[in-house]
Regions:
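Short alpha-helix
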Residues: 201-230
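A short SAM/SAH-binding and catalytic strip from SAM-dependent methyltransferases
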Residues: 135-149
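Conserved class I S-adenosyl-L-methionine
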Residues: 68-79
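Class I SAM-dependent methyltransferase SAM/SAH-binding core
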Residues: 77-126
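Class I SAM-dependent methyltransferase Rossmann-like catalytic core
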Residues: 15-68
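Short, glycine-/aromatic-enriched active-site segment of Class I SAM-dependent methyltransferases
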Residues: 174-205
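Conserved beta-strand signature within the Rossmann-like core of class I S-adenosyl-L-methionine
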Residues: 160-180
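A short, conserved alpha-helix within the catalytic core of class I
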Residues: 145-159, 166
């Protein structure tokens, strides 16, 4: 279990992280390259792994609207891997309107992933306006990457999509917020293997983990929590405190 370097604030964690952090040119370009390769691989051989079931479960919960595409706001969706999973599983006959909300660097780099059903936005309001009626807000593993997780969660809740699914997100059981620098390998970011021309190396970025109590309080302002997801009890640690990954399935 990796131990993150505890910090006093997001700003301190950002300063102690690798240059660029989540918007590092190397990190962003690798994630997009891996997503393009992932799309080609699934087109040639449609085989999904177990983690892909998170995306498929969210789609099943969203249902299928009549007479229009299924409309999904994918918060922190990287290079669009969740869309690729959905498109592979559902096929071209099931129309999708998918908006990924990401960093400006990712939105710019992910231009080759756009295909008429998938688009990228660095502004949540712009993504909402593009989608119109939102059937599902889907969030996988990005809330703890935000400088102010509670504020971003409040904005997601305020969209009032009929279904809200959170998965692979870091929470702490105790009160308050903890900040850290989290380390990983370049190869672990994005789906599939590294491009053969890219050497693996260490990367680091800020993490902000808020309490389950805070998360559930925000969710309950508009939603009923149907299910709590306990996915990984000790995904990593911060200053020796185990941090869990989990999520929620919510309905208006």
């Amino acid at each position: 279990m990796l131990d993150g370097l505890a910090c006093e604030s997001y700003e301190q964690a950002l300063a102690a992280s690798a240059k660029g952090a989540y918007e590092s040119a190397d990190l962003v370009s690798v994630i997009v390259a891996k997503n393009l390769a992932y799309r080609r691989a699934l087109s040639d051989r449609p085989v999904l792994d177990l983690p892909a079931l998170r995306t498929l479960a969210a789609l099943a919960i969203a249902g299928r609207p009549g007479g229009r595409p299924l409309s999904i706001l994918d918060f922190g969706g990287g290079g669009g891997s969740h869309y690729t999973i959905a498109r592979t599983a559902l096929g071209a006959s099931h129309p999708l309107k998918w908006a990924v909300v990401e960093t400006p660097a990712m939105v710019h780099a992910a231009a080759p992933m756009r295909d008429g059903s998938l688009d990228f936005f660095d502004d949540m309001d712009a993504a909402r306006d593009h989608l119109g009626q939102i059937d599902l807000v889907f969030h996988s593993g990005a809330l703890h990457c935000c400088p102010r997780p509670r504020s971003f969660l409040e904005r997601l809740v305020a969209l009032r999509a009929p279904r809200l699914v959170i998965t692979r997100t870091a929470f702490r059981d105790g009160p308050g917020t903890i900040y850290s620098v989290q380390k990983s390998r370049l190869s672990t970011n994005g789906p599939g293997p590294l491009p053969p021309t890219v050497a693996d190396r260490a990367v680091s970025y800020p993490n902000v983990v808020i309490s389950r109590q805070d998360v559930e309080g925000v969710l309950r302002t508009d939603y009923v929590i149907r299910v709590r997801l306990d996915e990984e009890a000790e995904a990593f640690s911060i200053g020796g405190e185990p941090i869990a990954l989990g999520g929620y399935i919510c309905a208006l």
